[in-house]
Swiss-Prot record:
Protein name as annotated: Lethal factor
Region (Disordered): 39-66
Location of region: IIB: 420-583
Cofactor: Zn(2+)
Species of origin: Bacillus anthracis
Span of the signal peptide: 1-33
Length: 809
């Protein structure tokens, strides 16, 4: 029997009296204050005597239930409706008042929220990140609908969300009310009851009774096509394997039972389902709620205590040395002035007294301040005459540093770095042996890391891993400096920029942690600069250790699959929620290797290189790993689209002939193998965003980040390719000498004349000026191309001459 909606309406209205009598609070047996069934004559005097008392108790009970409902709704229902829309808001609220308070209490217990909003529900923050597939929905009748035209949606997840459009229609339009209850039924079956043990055991008899009925009315009302077509009786195993189908039936039955003018339809066509809902009483819901609380460890204290208990023996067995090591991991050790001064030779001390630190272009502000403090301490040993002499020397800050002074400050720069294990692991991608730090300190890092690895021997275990989520708040810039400044809305810092967020999310598929993650057992409020809120599910074999104050330290070198990225709102401020699951790092490494193989095959073909040439390398080890890989495609396409193909092929072949690479990485550039042969400028390159290494003929690009004057990583890559053009042009001029063309007298003279006419970074030296001019000449912005021709015409002509020379060689 194919039940039409119109028919349901007629039946519903014809049974309106019945419906009204059945529309009291559901699942909760109410005391009937006046009269009842049975032998009235025998008890009429007693009942009349107690009538007032029963009525009073009844009113008190209903009042208690109403207060309980209001208290729950205060916690889970958020009204986001303008003042003039109050009538629409109230209509939606009245729908929720018909839902049993115990159902809403279970929803509250799992962290669920209900939002009543104006207009298009897809514009709500919780639904903005939905995929296009999930925006195609079906209503309770199986009719297709587009979410932006619909009025209610239940979003599943660890903390489910129900979004309801405010509308007066719910008062008269019972179908709209029915669909709201249908979505609530989905939450009840999918997000709550499915989490308890044997959730469908009692529902099995209901389904089989409907299936074996003499007519198909109950199936037509509630069953999905798959359930209708199932040839035999349903078993528990079948229901467990087809839980979505069962949840659909439950949600429909719930909706028909709750909506007053449709309740009689359920009783008429599927009486077994009606009786099931009718008996789904307060006691059963309470049992479900208790089981749910126990299984999900909803109490924050209980969750904390269980983890502490799991790691109690581990904590008790820690030696003082082990505790000190974990403290060292959490709190970087700042350098001590006295230790640094003591390590200096007398000659170095004399040099430090006279160096004009402000004129150093490779020291950070913090480093300059620290070195000035060293100078002050050393000056105490000067005579008054020497101090006066030193003051006169330092008045003129325009004097450049001598080469000797530069080399000394480069050495000293390493000595003033904090001893920070996690930062070191992040900078190197866990490759501790890279030579970007002096040997003694490197050995200390290796010892400490090996000892911490040994401490973290206990896994989280199968009893805990699937029941807990761990949390980490993160500064956006620690993940992506490119988008970090733009992700927060510039007009309202409580909001996230939607356009930038979509770009941020698009390439975020997997992650790697090469250092030790320190995570919170329970989510904590974010600091001002923490706008990323990670929620991480562990694997049972994740090794961890318990720290004080509700934190765990996780092993290094783990993989993370990104399950969802969405904007959430907490305390009137928007954050980005990243849901991730711990997986073996090897699984993520395989994804990266497959992507590297694919991109090399594509570009080898495009550039006419041998099939198995390994031109492109992904040296990726950190938390925004997938973005490095995905962005490489965009960077290379923009490079190809903005530079002459003949020039690209000629220069790329030159690089390949020298075993050169295009290295896309998220670790600092001095730690890249292709850079090891080029260590004389290692100190300046710690924070470099890009680098061309003539010795290895390789372009290194650090991301996700951008330089001071670069709009994106593509411009950085074109700048570095400009250095490769400089190198190849010099090689063609004299293959024996193989010097940069920018070292020619002709270009040195051009630099003296035009070197200050383009960008501040271009003023650094001849090579950087050439690369900056090359970048501007191949910009997607026509105005920047003209800028070189107008402001540096000789440079423009010189570079064009080199391009023609290379192409025709």
């Amino acid at each position: 029997m194919n039940i039409k909606k119109e028919f349901i309406k007629v039946i519903s209205m014809s049974c309106l009296v019945t419906a009204i009598t059945l529309s009291g609070p559901v699942f909760i047996p109410l005391v009937q204050g006046a009269g009842g069934h049975g032998d009235v004559g025998m008890h009429v005097k007693e009942k009349e005597k107690n009538k007032d008392e029963n009525k009073r108790k009844d009113e008190e009970r209903n009042k208690t239930q109403e207060e309980h409902l209001k208290e729950i709704m205060k916690h889970i229902v958020k009204i986001e409706v303008k003042g003039e829309e109050a009538v629409k808001k109230e209509a939606a609220e009245k729908l929720l008042e018909k839902v049993p308070s115990d159902v809403l209490e279970m929803y509250k217990a799992i962290g669920g929220k209900i939002y009543i909003v104006d207009g298009d529900i897809t514009k709500h923050i919780s639904l903005e990140a939905l995929s296009e597939d999930k925006k195609k929905i079906k209503d309770i009748y199986g009719k297709d609908a587009l979410l932006h035209e619909h009025y209610v949606y239940a979003k599943e997840g660890y903390e489910p969300v129900l979004v309801i459009q405010s509308s007066e229609d719910y008062v008269e339009n019972t179908e709209k009310a029915l669909n709201v209850y249908y979505e609530i039924g989905k939450i009840l079956s999918r997000d709550i009851l499915s989490k308890i043990n044997q959730p469908y055991q009692k529902f099995l008899d209901v389904l089989n009774t409907i299936k074996n009925a003499s007519d198909s009315d109950g199936q037509d009302l509630l069953f999905t096509n798959q359930l209708k077509e199932h040839p035999t009786d349903f078993s528990v195993e079948f229901l467990e394997q087809n839980s979505n189908e069962v949840q659909e039936v439950f949600a429909k039955a719930f909706a028909y039972y709750i909506e007053p003018q449709h309740r009689d339809v359920l009783q008429l066509y599927a009486p077994e389902a009606f009786n099931y809902m009718d008996k789904f009483n307060e006691q059963e819901i309470n049992l479900s709620l208790e089981e749910l609380k126990d299984q999900r460890m909803l109490a924050r204290y209980e969750k904390w205590e269980k983890i502490k208990q799991h790691y109690q023996h581990w904590s008790d067995s820690l030696s003082e040395e082990g505790r000190g090591l974990l403290k060292k991991l959490q709190i970087p050790i700042e350098p001590k002035k006295d230790d640094i001064i003591h390590s200096l030779s007398q000659e170095e001390k004399e040099l430090l007294k006279r160096i004009q630190i402000d004129s150093s272009d490779f020291l950070s502000t913090e480093e300059k301040e620290f070195l000035k403090k060293l100078q002050i301490d050393i000056r105490d040993s000067l005579s008054e005459e020497e101090k006066e002499l030193l003051n006169r020397i330092q008045v003129d800050s325009s004097n450049p540093l001598s080469e000797k002074e530069k080399e000394f400050l480069k050495k000293l720069k390493l000595d003033i770095q904090p001893y920070d294990i996690n930062q070191r692991l992040q900078d190197t991608g866990g490759l501790i042996d890279s030579p970007s730090i002096n040997l003694d300190v490197r050995k200390q890092y290796k010892r400490d890391i090996q000892n911490i690895d040994a401490l973290l021997h206990q896994s989280i275990g199968s009893t805990l891993y699937n029941k807990i989520y761990l949390y980490e708040n993160m500064n956006i810039n620690n993940l992506t400096a490119t988008l970090g400044a733009d992700l927060v809305d510039s007009t309202d810092n409580t909001k996230i920029n939607r356009g930038i967020f979509n770009e941020f999310k698009k390439n975020f598929k997997y992650s790697i942690s090469s250092n030790y993650m320190i995570v919170d057992i329970n989510e904590r409020p974010a600091l001002d600069n923490e706008r990323l809120k990670w929620r991480i599910q562990l694997s049972p074999d994740t090794r961890a250790g318990y720290l004080e104050n509700g934190k765990l330290i996780l092993q290094r070198n783990i993989g993370l699959e990104i399950k969802d990225v969405q904007i959430i709102k907490q305390s009137e401020k928007e954050y980005i929620r990243i849901d991730a699951k711990v997986v073996p790092k090897s699984k993520i490494d395989t994804k990266i290797q497959e992507a590297q193989l694919n991109i090399n095959q594509e570009w080898n073909k495009a550039l006419g290189l041998p099939k198995y040439t390994k031109l492109i390398t992904f040296n990726v080890h950190n938390r925004y790993a997938s973005n490095i890989v995905e962005s490489a495609y965009l960077i290379l396409n923009e490079w190809k689209n903005n530079i002459q193909s003949d020039l690209i092929k000629k220069v790329t072949n030159y690089l390949v002939d020298g075993n050169g690479r295009f290295v896309f990485t998220d670790i600092t550039l001095p730690n890249i193998a292709e850079q090891y042969t080029h260590q004389d400028e290692i100190y300046e390159q710690v924070h470099s965003k890009g680098l061309y290494v003539p010795e290895s003929r390789s372009i290194l690009l650090h991301g996700p980040s951008k330089g001071v004057e670069l709009r994106n990583d593509s411009e950085g890559f074109i700048h570095e390719f400009g250095h490769a053009v400089d190198d190849y042009a010099g090689y063609l001029l004299d293959k024996n000498q193989s010097d940069l063309v920018t070292n020619s007298k002709k270009f040195i003279d051009i630099f003296k004349e035009e070197g200050s006419n383009l960008t501040s970074y271009g003023r650094t030296n001849e090579a950087e000026f050439f690369a900056e001019a090359f970048r501007l000449m191949h910009s997607t912005d026509h105005a920047e191309r003209l800028k070189v021709q107008k402001n540096a015409p000789k440079t423009f002509q010189f570079i064009n001459d080199q391009i023609k020379f290379i192409i025709n060689s």
